Amino acid sequence: MASADTVSWTGDYAAKVTGGWITHPWLANGVSIDSRTVASGELFVALVGDRFDGHDYINAALKAGAAAAMVSRVPDAVEMEAPLLVVPNTQTGLSALGAGGRARSRAQVVGVTGSVGKTGTKEMLRLTLSAFGSVHASVRSYNNAIGVPLTLANLPEESDYAVVEIGMNHSGEIAALSELSRPHVAVVTTVAAAHLGNFNNVDEIASAKAEIFVGIEPGGIAVLNRDNPFFRQLRSAAEISVEQVIGFGCATDATIRLIKYDASPGCNTLTVEIEGNPLVYQLGADGLHWACNSLAVLGVIHGFGENTHTAVRCLAGFQGMQGRGVRHSINLGDGEIELIDDSYNANPVSMCAALELLGTSRPKHSGRRIAVLGDML
C-alpha cells in the first residue's frame, strides 16, 4: 500500500470521481493500465479491448504490488478481500480519473498536437519548462483516448507545468481530449498529409487539429506554425477562444522568427528574433525540423512570460529521441559507419525531413550517403 506522503489517489476520491464503489479502503500513488509494468502502490485499470481483457490480469497486477484494481466486473478468480474500485466501464472510468486529476491540479497545462513533431516538441517542453518549475508530461507517445486520461490521472497536484500530447485518428477526437485536459496553451506543430486514413484531404485534418482550441482555458494562448499553409485557418479557429496567437517560423511577421540556421552535427546554431529581440542558441538535435520544433517551444516559454535565454540553455544538450534522428557510430572493419536512426515511424512529411537530414550530412573521407527505406504501412 502506498505511504501517505506519496498518495495521489484514495479509494474514496476515486470512487467519487468515477461514480463507482470500493470493496475495501485503499491508497494509490499512481495509475497503470499494464499488469506487466504496474509499479508497487499503483491503481491497475483493467481496460477491455478487441483482443484483450484486463480483467484476466487483475491477480497478476495485485501480485506485482498494485494497490488496487479498477474493474467493471469481478472475475471468480479474484479473492473477495481484493481491493477493488468497481465502475460501469473501465475506459469511462479512466477518463473520469483523468478529469479528476486535472481538476485538482494547479499546473499550467500545454496541449501539443500536429501532424508531425508532437512527441519531440513535448519532450523539448519537458526539458525547458523544468528550468522554471516541476513538470509532468505524457509518457512516450501516449496521446489518444487512453494515453491522455492516463497522463492526467498521474498528474501530481504540486506540478507547476503539465505537457499533454494530443493525437487523433478521426474527427472529434481532439475536441474531447482538449476538453479533458483543458490546456492554457495549445500548440499545433504543423498540418500536413499524415494520418489521412479517416480524412478525405488535408483541409479536414486542419479542421480536426483546430479542435484543440475547444477546451482551452479562458485567457489561453495558441502557438501556431506561421509558415504552414493552414496558419490562417488555424488562427481564425483559435481566435474564437484564445486571447493571444503566437506564430513561429521564417515568415517576417512570425512572433518567434528564425533568421539563420547553421547546421553542425550535435551542435546546431539558431539565430532567432522574438518580437524583434535577437536570440542565439545551440540545439543538439540535428535537422531543420527539430529547429522548427524548438521555435514552437520558445513560443510556449514566451507565452508564459518566462525567460527565453534561460530556456534555450537547456536545448544544447537535447539530442533528439531514440528512433527519431539520433546518430550512432558503428565500427565496421577498418572503417566506421554513422547511422542516423529515424526508424520509429514514418509518413511522407517525416520521411522528407529524414532525407533532407541525410542530404545535408557530410560523410568522412568522401564517403557515400545511403538511405534504407521501408514501407509506410
Language-model segments: residues:
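N-terminal leader/targeting and accessory segments in enzymes
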Residues: M1-A96, G100, R368, L377
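Active-site flanking residues adjacent to catalytic metal/cofactor-binding acidic residues
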Residues: G41, V164, L224, I340-D341, ...
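Phosphate-binding loop of NTP-binding sites
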Residues: Y13, G93-R226, F230-E243
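Buried hydrophobic packing segments
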Residues: L94-L97, L125, L129, T151-L152, ...
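Active-site beta-alpha connecting loops in nucleotide-dependent enzymes
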Residues: G49-F52, M321, S343-L377
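Conserved beta-strand scaffold positions in the cores of enzyme catalytic domains, especially
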Residues: L84-V86, V109, S134-A137, V245-G247, ...
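Acidic, Mg2+-coordinating active-site environments of NTP-dependent enzymes
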Residues: P75-M80, V187-E338, T360, S366-G367
